[in-house]
Structures are given as C-alpha cells and as structure tokens.
Amino acid sequence: MNLLIYGPQFAAYGGMERHLCLVAEAAAQAGHRTALLTTSNSLAADWRERLRTAGVDLRELPAARGTAGGVAKAWWLLRQTLALRATRWDVIYTNGQGALAQIVWLAARRGSRRLHHHHTAADTAEQRTWTPGFRRVLADAGELVGCSRYTAERLDEATGRRDARFLPYLTETAFVTPPPAAPSAGATLRFGFLGRLVSTKGLDTILRLAADPACDGIEWHIHGAGPDYPPERFADVRHLTYHGAYTGPAQQAAALVDLDAVVLFSVHNEGMPLSLIETMAAGLPWVASARGGTPELAESAGDCELVQHPEDYDECRAAVLRLAARLHDGLTSRAAQRAVWERRFAPAVVRAQWLEFLTKR
C-alpha cells in the first residue's frame, strides 16, 4: 500500500497529531510507503525523529503553527501534492475541518481511495461554522470516518450519506504497567482537568468547586494551556494547583499518576475526548458531560459519572461528590476502568483496526 496522509497545522503534542503520527509510523513499519503532509513545522522534535526512523516521508511547511496565511498554505500544499503525483497512492487520508483536503486529493489517480477523518462532534452548532469548501470535502470524500459513533451519525445527517464509520483514535500512553493504587480511605482526593483551557470546557465550574466548602476534601489540579485562562487566573485559588501544559508522554504520565479522578464539564458536544481515553489508560474514574460521544466511554458504570446538564453547577457538584464518596468507600475499580481501555483503545488493538481499514480493497 502507498499511503498519503494530510493533517492541518500540527502542534507539538496535540491529540490529532499523535493519532496521525502513530498511524503513519505503524503503516511505515508494516512495510507500506507512507508520506505525511502538514502545514506547519511545530511538531515536537522527538516525533520527527520517530517518523523518519520508521521511514515516513514527513513534509512540513516551514512556518510555525498559526503563522502561515491561507494562500501560503494552499500554495505550498499544491506544490507538494503535484510533486507527490509521481507516486500512485492507494489511499489518501485527510483530516481536520478545512477545505485544503481538496488540494491533497489532486494526488489521487484512478482507483485511489480518498478518506476524510472528522475529529470533532459535527453537531448542528458546529455545522453552522462549516465553510462551503469544507462541505464539499465531506460530500466528495470517498469514505468518511468519525472519531465516535455520535460523530459518524452526525456526518451522515449533515451530508445525506449513510456510510460514515467510527474508528477510535490511535494513541499511546506511558501507562504500560498496571495503574497506580487507589486512594486510601479518608485521604484528600486529587481531581484534575487535562486539556485546552477554553471557556467551553467547564473551567469556571472547577473554580467554583475549588472554593466550595462542600468540596473541602478535594484538591484540584489543572494541566493545560489556552487563551481563555492565563496562569494568573488560577493564582491564589484555594485547593487548586495550576501545572501548565505537558509536552510529552513522561509529563502526561506524571500528571495522571498524581490524580484520583478527572473531570470534563464541557458545555458543547465532544467528539470523543482523548483526555478521557488517556485517563482510562491510567485506570482513573471520571466525571464528564453526557454530550456528544462521551457516553460511549462510560462502560464501567461505577467509574464514570455523566452530567446531563453541565451548565447546572449543583448537578456538577453532586456528581463530583458522588464519585468522591465512592472513591472513599473503595467502590471504584481502576482495574475495571483500565480493562475497558485495554479492550477498546490499547495501541495494539487500534493499530490493527486502522491497518486493516487502510489496506482493504
């Protein structure tokens, strides 16, 4: 198989970036010719080295993430695509929410499969933001992949198709050994948030919980960065520690091993939150909004609290306190939560699913 992958401007250690790098690495290691195009050069250096060691032809626009304009990205991508037409690509696998995938498809020949992968919820609110160019991408793709069953269903509704499918993220975690021990009875609990610090993720709810006397037995730990919440926003908040963003698997593992639970009070529909998948790799329970694809993760009932109305502070607090009580009473199971991850999201499992999908004819 000859596989051409395109992902829009990469961050150093983002979720979509990790998925695409791992797919490219897996394909190359399996003996398939693989090229990876991205419209920035902000990918972490260790990822560049891994890809090149595996034999991936990595092509990056020589500009930092967020600095190149639309014309510059389109022109660079067109030149790269025309050069890549010398190879007959069996699969052209594009990603993201933009119209530039159409340029990469110019590398297709008769018989090439054109796959497009959507990584967010694709709900009605999101659809209102789609450009005409991106709608053409969804309509013209030979195959559509959603990051959750919820997303796949919304893609079908939006396009009038009936063939979008779900495939899980290929991700890896530093947790290759059994998860850490559960907290002892009566111990102060450590609840955390992991991800981009934006207003739709429920950070204001966490700030209220940290100041709430009903939650005095809980410490709060924030791991992430984003424009809506500069570090000083968390200064002098009692029971709360801001750690900044992690930039690699070692920092990610250190963040998770120090937590007892994770929260995600999204007020919008999620595709399938990668932070919760990685939380489950560590065997940690979580509290999250019952929005988008998130309920698809809630298999181990005692380790998952779904909040139906994340805008309702009292409902969020009640869910946190229920999980805290179960943690103190020894009624959560890190082994059960980890088992769900191993069955559905472990790298070996998902790698095999993606390679089977990409190589089918």
Regions found by a protein language model. Name each.
Residues 6-13, 19-20, 26, 30-69, ...:
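N-terminal strand-loop element at the rim of the active site
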Residues 14-22, 193-212:
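A conserved mid-protein helix/loop that constitutes part of the nucleotide-sugar donor-binding site
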Residues 139-164, 171-173:
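A short, active-site helix/loop in glycosyltransferases that binds the activated sugar's phosphate group
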Residues 231-250:
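Nucleotide-activated donor-binding/catalytic signature segment of Leloir-type glycosyltransferases, i.e.
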Residues 300-314, 322-328:
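Conserved acidic donor-binding segment of nucleotide-sugar-dependent glycosyltransferases
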Residues 311, 328-359:
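A charged, aromatic-enriched C-terminal amphipathic alpha-helix characteristic of glycosyltransferases
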